[in-house]
Every structure is written in C-alpha cells, then in structure tokens.
C-alpha cells in the first residue's frame, strides 16, 4: 500500500492539510474508478490524497504553479538551507531577526545559488528566513523584508512517490475543465486563490471577474470547493441570489480614475462612476 501524506512536502500558500481528514470523508461518497480533476492543483495534496484513497481512479493534477519542479530541486534546496543554517549557527536565537553582516552573507549565498544554477526555490526559502507566512519570489523583494532565523533543523524529505500515479497537466483551469466537463460522473476539485487574499505566489494574475468565472465550473457537476472566511465569495453569491433582477447598475456609466500613492511603494486607484438618468 502506498504511503499517504497529509501535508505537502514543501511549503505552499493555501495547502489544505488542515482539511485533509474532512476531505477524505467526502471522497468516501464516490466509487473507486471515478474521474477526479484537480483544477487548481497547487501543492498536489488534494490529488495525492484522492489517488491514495481511490487507486483505480484517474486523478488529473493541474500543476499550473510547477510544484513538481520545486520537488525535483529538493536536494539543491536542502543544500542551500544547510549552508544558511551553518552560517547562522547559534549566533541568532530561533525566530529572532538576522541583521548586519550575517544578513548580507545570506543574500550573497542565495545570489550565488541563483547565478550558478539558474534556480532558487524562493517559496521554500521564504518559509525559513522570512516572518511567518511572508513569501517573496526574488532576492530584490526579500531585501525589503526583515530576515528571521526560522531555518529548518533538517532538510526536506524528497518524497519521490508523492505525485505517483497522477495524470499531470499544466495549463489554464478553463482548458482542463473543458476537456473533462462532459465525462459522466466527473468530480471537480476546486481550490482557487481566495478572494481578498494575497495571490502573489501564484503564476497568474487574478481579478474579481476571474474569481467569479470559477463558479461556472460548479453548475451541473459534482465538486468539492474550497474557500475561507477571509474570502467574501459566499456572501457575494448569497446577495446576488437575493437580488437576481438588479443586473449591472454601472452599465453605460462614465468612469473616472485617479492614481493615489500611500507611500513610496504602495498605491491604489480611486474611481468615480456617474450616470445621469433621463428626466
């Protein structure tokens, strides 16, 4: 029997380890042999659990964020973390800020890794040297943050069997959906980036329309959909359900935009919309 992991081998924003056991209960409703399509594959945890419990099922894992590439580089990432761990030693207590010359040495080592190999797993690295749940994707962005000694005491296991048996694709979720939507009994696993949360580590830009487009895949299909109380998507859908005749109140209006700057690296766009109804 294959080993089943209840958390992803490498850090990933929004992996569903806290819901793993509840998700397993949902899977019990479906026979082995059902087609499962993980539209937003993320860390692959949902796909992995599904394949572990339903070994005769086809499980399609949409690895749009290239998680498998990060896993392939675990030995390289472990070596980089080991070098940083040795640099820090006992000079900085756990979870305290890394400052001064040591901070610069760490950045130099990361830059050396990127220049010599062409790759650094910045998400995994962020979890070891940035404040909890902060993730940056370049040395340039990391330099804007304080470094912390959150470095793992041991390397990450390679988990070579984690994605075993999955049918792996890497494309827009709409394309994956359209390929499989007419297959009888298909179950869609739908775990999009959450509305009103940071999507900076995802490989695509998301706006409000993108979040709402996802809801199209739910109608008429079996699904397991994930969200959180940090997202307002359920509240929005409930409101729309109660106000079905509203339509678009901003249709044919005029929009004026103004770029507002809060500080040197933060800005937003103020908008004014107006329309004069005929008398």
Predicted regions and their residues:
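A short acidic (Asp/Glu
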Residues: 46-52, 70-73, 180, 197-203, ...
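Well-ordered, non-membrane alpha-helical segments in soluble/globular domains
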Residues: 148-153, 204-214
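S-adenosyl-L-methionine
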Residues: 1-35, 45
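Conserved proline-anchored active-site loop of SAM-dependent methyltransferases
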Residues: 38-50, 61-65, 127-132, 182-198
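Class I S-adenosyl-L-methionine-dependent methyltransferase module
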Residues: 57-163, 276-279
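Short, surface-exposed basic-aromatic patches at helix termini and helix-loop junctions that form
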Residues: 28, 50-58, 181-185, 216, ...
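Long, positively charged, glycine-interspersed low-complexity recognition regions
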Residues: 208-279
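Active-site segment flanking the S-adenosylmethionine/decSAM binding pocket
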Residues: 165-211
